[in-house]
Amino acid sequence: MEKKNRLILALDVTDRENALRIANEVSDYVDSIKVGYPLVLGEGLSIVKELVEIAPVIADFKVADIPNTDRLICEHVFNAGAAGIITHGFTGRDSLDSCVKVANEFGTDVYVVTEMSHPGGVEFFRPVAEDIASMAVEAGASGVVAPATRPERVKDIRKIIGEELSIISPGVGAQGGSAADVIRAGADWVIVGRSIYNSDSPAEAAKKICDEMNC
């Protein structure tokens, strides 16, 4: 993913018309659009094929299954045109290897969750986040997901992965994270959803976040 604006839109709306409208409005300010279950369950994977005409798409399915099932999920996502997928790492190295193998075949990216951004994200992830980050490096993943709500954790993860992997960081805006703070902590991109798509002017909201990061 080309680092231009350092902003990823989390497009967690549920209908096609709204999704395409917002995506088009913010296209000048985002490097990628992240879609998850709310939109894909509502509109099907075909929405990915439409969104990739606007910006690269990351499928946030937090893939977490046995290797064969993970492989099938990744193949469907990448065949739909997604440029990347988000997976969990707690299912182990063989499951992650399966995702990375498919991504390598398609020339796409895998981002591994190290620690989630909501308060409950520390309950079980905190003790294993560093191990997951190390595994992501060893498996050849493209990057990791680390919380903008806890910039100190982004610093910790960056120390482990070095400059080999990218960090994409959710939790800016509605969850309380600061885009500028987490970029300073070592994130490559921030992921922002509600603060943009619930705004009266998504483009202005996206521009404001970009300005905060001086991008």
Curated annotation (Swiss-Prot):
Keywords: Decarboxylase, Lyase, Pyrimidine biosynthesis. GO terms for molecular function: orotidine-5'-phosphate decarboxylase activity. SMART domains: OMPdecase. It comes from the Archaea. The keyword Cell membrane does not apply. Pathway: Pyrimidine metabolism; UMP biosynthesis via de novo pathway; UMP from orotate: step 2/2. HAMAP family: OMPdecase_type1_A (MF_01200_A). Belongs to the OMP decarboxylase family. Type 1 subfamily. This is Orotidine 5'-phosphate decarboxylase. The gene is pyrF.
